Amino acid sequence: MDASEEAKRVSIQVTSLSTQLIESVDKQSHLEEQLNKSLKTIASQKAAIENYNQLKEDYNTLKRELSDRDDEVKRLREDIAKENELRTKAEEEADKLNKEVEDLTASLFDEANNMVADARKEKYAIEILNKRLTEQLREKDTLLDTLTLQLKNLKKVMHSLDNESTVTNNSNRYSTILSDSATSSSTSLNKVPTSYSLASQDIYSGIVYSPSISSIRYDISLYNEFLKFVAALPRCENIKATSTESKLIRRLVNDEIQPILKIDNASGIGWLVKKTLLSLIIDGLVVVEPLSGVNATYQIGYNSSSPAKQATSNMPKMFKFPLDSPPVAVHAACSFCGESRDDIIEHARMYILKTLHKTDDGKEQVTNTYPLCHWCLLKLRQTCEIFAFLRSLKVGAWHLEKLTTQNITKEDLEKFSEVTKHTKRDGRVSSQDKKTKRLSFMAGLGINSSTKNKPKMEIFSSETNAKPGQPTTNIQRAWLQLCKLRCILHWTHIGIWAVDDSISSKIGPLVEDDSDEDQNDAISVRLQDKALWKQDAKRPFSSSSAEESQKSDAFDFESGDMENEITGESSSDESSSDGSSTDNSTADSSSEDESSLADSTTSSADSSSPESIDNGEGDDTVTKDDKSSIKSANNNEENSDCGDKKGRSIIKKKAPQRKIQKKKLLQDLDDLEEQFREESAIDQTEFENAESNVKQNISSKRASSGDENSKKDNNEKTLKTNLTIGDKTQEQIGENSPSSGLHASSSNDDNFDDAQEQQ
């Protein structure tokens, strides 16, 4: 029994020892795994330490470079101070030289004035001598005239004495001469036209009807619509867009153009084109041209030399066909009125109407062509002239006065409807003048002629020289031009062969010349006769801008003799004073803009200084504050100069804060380095202690199994404590590793650099 119990006890002990052995082997394997892990962590920490050392070296090099740059900045500031001193000295010297130059110029001007005065004195003396000489010459001329008269009288006396001997012979001859002269006079009287025949010829060669310019009215509703049209032009893209504020185009189309053209009754035009033709004419997308250039030589009023001479000349050919060739026409009927006669040239369809369409590229393409007779040609051309004139007002070729729809009051309407009035006696003749003219037909033989004949002085002014009823503003002149074009349109509807036959005046705008010394005096463009306009047409018309002249090439805005207007001096003075005030305001605004630009450049220069670059190492809060300060500074720069100063003060206040934050960051980096070193040393000591404990446990197990059983619990406790300590240290190392701190600082540096770039 005892042996069996001992065997059981031994077997139990063996099993327990085997289990302990297995557990110890497992623990040993587990410890070896932990050892490998710890070795790996140590290797990874060594790489991190190397990266940290390299970054530290880079930081030191950057710090040195910054110090070098600071030294350079100081040196440059010293150089700037020296240059400023030199500049002040140079400015002082320049001021001295300017004063000397001013003194020299003053002395030169004094000498020049003295020379001019001497020259004028000499000129005055020479003029007096010339006057005396001219008077002497006149006296000599009168003497010569008297002597020549005396000689003529003497010659007559001599001839009379010579002819006394032959009086008898000359008497017969004289009778025959009288008979011949009588017959010739009778025949000539028969040939001379009477006053009645001359009057009849003048009547049938004159103008049918043409109203004078002074009879044009400015108090009708259509003129008010014209003023609204002028006021709405600057705000609209084209003249069709003015229909919302003015009824001018609508009334012109409905009351005058549509009844004359009768597009709805046109047989040769499609219904789609009928709807869009007037809008195309308003936009200027219509072309009226002859089928051949030779057709222009067959129109009424065309004057040219003989075609044979032109054919034999060496001049270049203007037309495809020779000048003596017949005109080119179309057999098709007119698209508007249906004219189909071919009996005379005037009834032929020698012209065509082309409708255009604008492509996406801005080019114009021909969509339709329609033949035109002479009657419809004049009507269409005149409608195109009317809308081209309205488009020229939109371009600004007529230099219209500024007018707004809100300011169209009764006073403004009176201002733009005023015309020139009589300023003298309207050509009336006094009763005393009539008496003197009745009493004698010879000059100076009337009653009290010596007392009645008084010297007259001519006053050259627009008020005295201008006829009554003339326009005083460019808006009135534009209205006159529109009335003239409308009148021609009505005459084309009545039926005429030519348009330019009865045009006796050309109307143009008032043009202000900036080169004149007196800018308040306006220059008026006078209405002139056709003969004067032809003489003055050779002179070029000076427009205010090249673009307006290019756009208004189809119209004649040529002016004749220019006269200064005195009637609008008060308005011109007010406008000039307003213009000067606006000029001053614009100059002040421009100076403020320049100062704001200068301040913005200085603020940008301050922000890009090396001090701001040095302060680029900050956290996220620093970058957000910088962005907000930059935005506020930019807003203040755009608003006013005071805002610029505030923005610069904000940026300057941020600079010391950045320096403090930089120092804090450097201290934090140093603390992290010390903590990392201490923790790594502690980890190494703890790991070595754990290794020694494991080795001691293994040796003790191999030496004696009994001792292992007794020390089992103690070894397990120590191993657990060591493992927990190692895990905690690894977690702390992972949390406090330098890589994470460096990444955070680098991200903050990037954010700060972005903020600096924005600033």
Curated annotation (Swiss-Prot):
Any one GO molecular function term: guanyl-nucleotide exchange factor activity
Coiled-coil residue spans: 26-164, 651-682, 732-759
Residue ranges, compositional bias (Basic and acidic residues): 704-719
Chain positions found as Phosphothreonine: T168
Keywords, sorted A to Z: Acetylation, Coiled coil, Cytoplasmic vesicle, Guanine-nucleotide releasing factor, Phosphoprotein, Protein transport, Transport
Misc note: Present with 13200 molecules/cell in log phase SD medium.
Role, per record: Guanine nucleotide exchange factor for SEC4, catalyzing the dissociation of GDP from SEC4 and also potently promoting binding of GTP. Activation of SEC4 by SEC2 is needed for the directed transport of vesicles to sites of exocytosis. Binds the Rab GTPase YPT32, but does not have exchange activity on YPT32.
Name of the protein in its database record: Rab guanine nucleotide exchange factor SEC2
Gene symbol of the encoding locus: SEC2
